[in-house]
């Protein structure tokens, strides 16, 4: 029976039973463990997404701000990227015109591949070699690449529901998450207006900002700047456009060319070129129920309900101009 090729440089080996995966870096092994445990401990505080590593979360956070810190330095090029890998690929492909080709030297073949591992996998087909074997008991299926084997191994993995009395088992993590949201989603009701939330943090914020009138303040962290904002979006927009001069989102409308630091700002600007969108928005707003008027701002934490006592809030006057 065939065995997996083992790279001597991959010193970080998975300790789970029947798993032979190994990695060259500790963080890659840590991310791999998520496959076995189903845990994704790094959660985004701006959306519902979760990640296996802090690096993945940091890269994801850039999608909210629109910030692309790695800029191409080639003359006349204004492209920027969220990672060094993206920048490197851009430079090699666009400016250096590098196209790597790996040619099969098997007699009568001469097929070309962009990646060396693709060629290596292809040669295994010529020699009828299937070096990557599934180690799950009673299976024994073999594949030409580790990627194909990993894809196959997912049929053996299941994610059992942790709720008592529920026998659901997801074949994929996304399937398990969808089940959790559909069947076991927690419903938290506001005792002041009966509005329902699915996360305790959102309910707390709702009570503070809607019923108690508290306004959260985000202060600019740049030295010498006293600007404050009531939303994280406005603060990010201020820092990117005013302090760092980054405006990555450009209006595609002919003859416009205005640039914005945040994607949301570009979308709002698009109404200028398409007034019909504004009419539709107004029509939608008129159909909504009128929101409750917030109470006077609360400036003393002692007036907050006991369950919100631990929150640290700044209730000073805010400014909203970048």
UniProtKB/Swiss-Prot annotation:
Keywords of the record? DNA-binding, Metal-binding, Nucleus, Repeat, Ribosome biogenesis, RNA-binding, Transcription, Transcription regulation, Zinc, Zinc-finger
Q: Where are the zinc-finger regions (C2H2-type) in this chain?
A: 12-36, 42-64, 70-95, 102-126, 132-156, 159-184, 188-211, 218-243, 249-273
Q: Which GO terms describe its cellular component?
A: nucleus
GO biological process terms held by the UniProt record: positive regulation of DNA-templated transcription; ribosomal large subunit biogenesis
Q: Where is it predominantly found?
A: nucleus
Span list, region Disordered: 272-322
Keyword Zinc-finger assigned: yes
**Which spans does this entry mark as compositional bias, Polar residues?**
312-322
Q: Where is the composition biased (Basic residues)?
A: 278-292
What is the name listed in the Swiss-Prot or TrEMBL entry for this protein?
Answer: Transcription factor IIIA
**Species name for this entry?**
Ictalurus punctatus
Lineage per the UniProt record: Eukaryota, Metazoa, Chordata, Craniata, Vertebrata
Q: Which gene encodes it?
A: gtf3a
């Amino acid at each position: 029976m065939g065995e997996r090729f083992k790279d001597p440089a991959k010193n970080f080996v998975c300790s789970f039973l029947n798993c032979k995966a190994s990695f060259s870096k500790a963080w890659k092994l840590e991310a791999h463990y998520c496959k076995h445990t189903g845990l994704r401990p790094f959660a985004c505080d701006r959306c519902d997404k979760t990640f296996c590593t802090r690096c993945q979360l940091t890269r994801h956070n850039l999608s909210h701000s629109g910030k692309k810190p790695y800029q191409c330095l080639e003359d006349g090029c204004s492209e920027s990227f969220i990672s060094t890998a993206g920048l490197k690929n851009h430079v090699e492909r666009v400016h250096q015109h590098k196209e790597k080709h790996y040619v099969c030297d098997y007699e009568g073949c001469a097929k070309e591949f962009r990646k060396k591992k693709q060629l290596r996998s292809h040669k295994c087909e010529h020699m009828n070699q299937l070096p990557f074997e599934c180690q799950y008991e009673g299976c024994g299926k073999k594949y030409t690449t580790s990627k194909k084997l990993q894809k196959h191994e997912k049929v053996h993995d299941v994610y059992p529901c942790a709720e008592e009395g529920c026998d659901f088992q997801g074949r994929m993590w996304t399937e398990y998450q969808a089940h959790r949201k559909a069947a076991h989603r927690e419903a938290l009701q506001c005792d002041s207006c009966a509005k329902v939330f699915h996360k305790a943090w959102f309910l707390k914020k709702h009570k503070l900002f809607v019923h108690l009138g508290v306004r959260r303040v985000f202060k600019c962290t740049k030295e010498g700047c006293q600007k404050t904002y009531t939303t994280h979006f406005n603060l990010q927009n201020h820092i990117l456009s005013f302090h760092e001069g980054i405006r990555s989102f450009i209006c595609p409308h002919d003859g416009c060319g205005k640039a914005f630091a945040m994607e949301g700002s570009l979308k709002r600007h698009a109404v200028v070129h398409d007034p019909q969108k504004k009419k539709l928005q107004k029509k939608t707003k008129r159909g909504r129920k009128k929101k409750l008027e917030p109470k006077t701002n609360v400036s003393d934490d002692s007036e907050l309900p006991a369950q919100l006592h631990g929150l640290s809030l700044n209730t000073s006057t805010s400014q909203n101009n970048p």
